[in-house]
């Protein structure tokens, strides 16, 4: 969502999602079970990201507003969410006193421990709950047409090398891009 093409892409993505919501693949008159998720990197510094400051008073707000408007139900924390540090990310998730409500969805990551990061620790909510706005969790449970679906987020273990995750504890570590079978097992167990 960081490039200027995001303004063109958001309506197209929304149209595709709305078409999928209107599908009746079972031909039973019931809407199909659709969940709208993002794999992360929904906030990427760039021209569009920076232009948000002129319009919304702070960089990145437009990215969150687009995700909210699209109806995203959960986003995995990608490495780019941390590019400007955890204090900046916390402000985008939680909102601000100037009227920006923040993210209408949770950010997910099961392999990051936020308890040691003063900026994000207060946004962490219990796992296995319905999606909560302005929050971070390892998991969430989304109910669609009475059916509960569990979501688990994971963030690249190299985030500390390629971004700025602050005081977050990352699992598995050390992780050099050539994981051992033990490291892969640790990540899979998350």
Please provide the spans of the model-predicted regions.
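Acidic, metal/ion-coordinating pockets
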Residues: 1-190
């Amino acid at each position: 969502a960081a490039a200027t093409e995001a303004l063109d892409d958001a309506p197209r993505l929304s149209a595709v999602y709305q078409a999928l919501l209107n599908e009746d693949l079972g031909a039973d008159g019931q809407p199909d079970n659709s969940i709208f998720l993002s794999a992360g990197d929904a906030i990427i510094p760039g021209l569009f990201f920076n232009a948000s400051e002129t319009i919304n008073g702070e960089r990145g707000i437009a990215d969150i507003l687009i995700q909210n408007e699209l109806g995203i139900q959960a986003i995995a924390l990608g490495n780019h969410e941390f590019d400007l540090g955890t204090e900046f990310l916390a402000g985008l998730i939680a909102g601000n006193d100037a009227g920006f409500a923040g993210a209408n969805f949770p950010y997910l990551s099961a392999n990051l421990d936020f308890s040691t990061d003063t900026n994000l620790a207060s946004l962490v909510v219990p796992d296995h709950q319905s999606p909560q706005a302005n929050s971070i969790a390892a998991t969430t449970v989304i109910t669609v047409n009475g059916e509960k679906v569990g979501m688990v987020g994971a963030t690249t273990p190299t985030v500390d090398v390629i971004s700025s995750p602050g005081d977050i504890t990352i699992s598995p570590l050390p992780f050099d891009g050539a994981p051992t079978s033990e490291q892969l097992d640790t990540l899979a167990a998350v």
